[in-house]
Amino acid sequence: MQDANAAFAQYPSLKDRTVIVTGGATGIGESIVTHFARQGSRVAFLDIQDGPAEELIIALASKGCPRPLYFHCDLTDLATLQAIFKQALDALGSIDVLVNNAANDQRHSVEEVTPAFFDTSIATNLRPQFFAIQAVIPAMRSAGRGSIINMSSISWMIPSIGVPLYVAAKAAIVGLTRTLAHELGPHNIRVNAVLPGAIVTERQRRLWYTPEYKAEIMASQALKRDILPDDVARLVLFLAADDSSAITNQSYIIDGGWV
């Protein structure tokens, strides 16, 4: 179990840094937004879940954190995504950190995938990451720095059945991360990937985290405890902070020792 009284890192370099998080209203994204706000960062986040987004903003404001900006955005609509990123960049005035977190792991078999479902899955789990990066590059290049953190998954590294398109997209994100790290490195823009394992979010608890699935996870992990959204968020903070200024082109697994 985690120590409830543990003290975690505060990163001075993240104070007043500007951050955009996709899929920031719930789950891992909510924890990422919360952790950046606690660091004193200026955060904007995108999501399609207005209710949870507003609840998060109110909760953070009540704790004295900088009030994050929320933008309703369907990431599968590319024109809307590009327009919202322009609005977010205009509102923040600059961009130091991009966290490409949004995804959808809807279960699907090979047989039931239609061309339309294929396109929607890629338009949710891969295409937005590329075009979000494209949107922030000019501002990061002008600033002479930036940290881009792409959320992949260990799903492509283990026997994952029932989510072939999700797995394919998550594998592609690692390739995208590696090539862009080299392309953007000369501009002091770092690009890294985070590969979570079985993270116990509220959605996972509601849909799939049965006693049988938990037993499978615990049999696979070296650490015999739930891996939580906060665990992922703390890794993201490190990769965003100046403490990791020499780190790029890396893929960090956070799965309790499953892989």
List each language-model region with its residue ranges.
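C-terminal substrate-recognition "lid" of short-chain dehydrogenase/reductases
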Residues: 130, 145, 226-254
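Short, small/polar-rich loop/turn modules that mediate ligand/substrate recognition or access, typified
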Residues: 99, 185, 190, 247-249
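Active-site helix of classical SDR
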Residues: 133, 169, 177
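Short C-terminal tail/terminal secondary-structure segment
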Residues: 2-11, 158, 237, 248-259
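Alpha-helical segment proximal to the catalytic Tyr-Lys
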Residues: 138, 182-186, 245
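Residue(s) in the substrate-gating loop at a strand-loop-helix junction
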Residues: 153
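Substrate-binding pocket helix/loop in short-chain dehydrogenase/reductase
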Residues: 109-110, 114-122, 217
